[in-house]
Structures are given as structure tokens and as C-alpha cells.
Amino acid sequence: MQGAVDLLVDGTDRRVGAIRVEGPPAPDHPSKAAPIPRSCNGEPETEGNLVRWSFLECDGGVTSVVNRMKDEGQFKRIRGQAKYTFLAIKAILKWEKQSGTIKIDLGDRTPVDLSGLFCMSMCQTFGGGYRVAPGARPTQGYSSLVMAWGLSKPQMLGLMGPLEKGKHIGRWGVTMQDAMRFEFGDVTGPPMFLNVDGEAVITTPATMQYHDDQLTVRGADSIPNEVSGADGEI
């Protein structure tokens, strides 16, 4: 406790970025009310859309299905990371193929098989310790975009272990790159949920835009991720 107090009093301030996320709001559910627009998030570019700001990461695909299932109360009697493991297995086994399009920064819009996931992140870990974006750090001045598309169900199941350890990049076509803007839409099936800092509050079509220098975070004088880029937790 004293260490936390000391950090609050004498810690080092760092400026970090944020991702502005815009898309249609997630629908209402008996176990989870529809998200409410807040004026502090700013006005949407498209009427009826919801705007949220992410200070950690936003993601979609199997991961957002998992979060929505959690919000709906599935496996509610199971606690901890085991809940997410069971939810992920169920989401993968019930996954139905659909396609969509993506656009990264100023590149062309590209069709993709959405069997898999994406994560636009400013930190290394999420979901109870999964190292989704190895080496990403909040002070890097851009987001790290991880994509895993066109996976079979066995591949999605097989990716869970490497994903937890940060050993998934390059496996089965999984990529990671720097990105400032990501557009995700034209989904052939039902709209896909998107997580914003762990909450499935937005659906496709959606845009994600990184903005630097948005928030001051106070912490230790020296943090590992600034030295080596190896630990991006925040």
C-alpha cells in the first residue's frame, strides 16, 4: 500500500495515446443493457453511431464473441481465467464462417475470411494475461495491429496456447504491424461485436483511429517496456 501511495505522490508522468472507436451500438439484452452515448466521447461522424475511446485495446472476432457470451451470463458460475477458456472453446466450436472487409491506414479495402480475430492494441496483454501484441507499449506513439484471419476451427483452438505466451505471430499467417487507423465492415452475416477495453459495446461497421498524447499516466521512474519493449502491460 505504501508503495502505491509513493507512486501517486512522486511517480513519473507519461503521456499515452488512445483509440477513438465508432460504430453502431451493441443491441440491448436482458443481461446487458445497450450502451448509452456520452457527450464526453464527442459526436459520431455517422448519425446513430456510438463513440468510445480505448486506452488499452479494441478487438473483434472470436474474442468479442467470448465477451458478449460473458455479458449474456454464460458460464457465470465459473470464475477466473477458466471462464474465458470455456467461453473461447464454445465460441470456436459454434463459429459460423463469414466474410468482411478491412482497411489499414491509407491502404486499399481488402476482403477477408473473418474466422479468427484482430486486436488493435497499445499494450502487450489482455484477457487475463494473454500476450496478444508482444512488445507493444503504451508510450510507443502508435497502435499495434494483430490479425489472424482465415483460420479453421482446429487452428483457432490450437492458437489459444501460443496466444497466451505471445508465440503466435507468424503462425498460420498471424501478423502484427504498426497502424494508426483500422476500418472493419461489410460483414456478410450478422453484425460482429467489437470489444473496447474489454466491453462488447460496438458492432460493425466500425472505424478505429489512434490519437497520440491523450492521457497522463503516473508510474515508476523506470518501466521495463520503455527499456526493452518486452513488457507492454499497463
PLM-predicted stretches and their roles:
Residues 6, 12, 56, 122-124, ...:
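Short, flexible coil/turn micro-motifs enriched in small/turn-prone residues
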Residues 24, 123, 150-151:
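Short loop segments at secondary-structure junctions
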Residues 59, 63, 119-133, 199-200:
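Glycine-rich phosphate/pyrophosphate-binding beta-alpha loops
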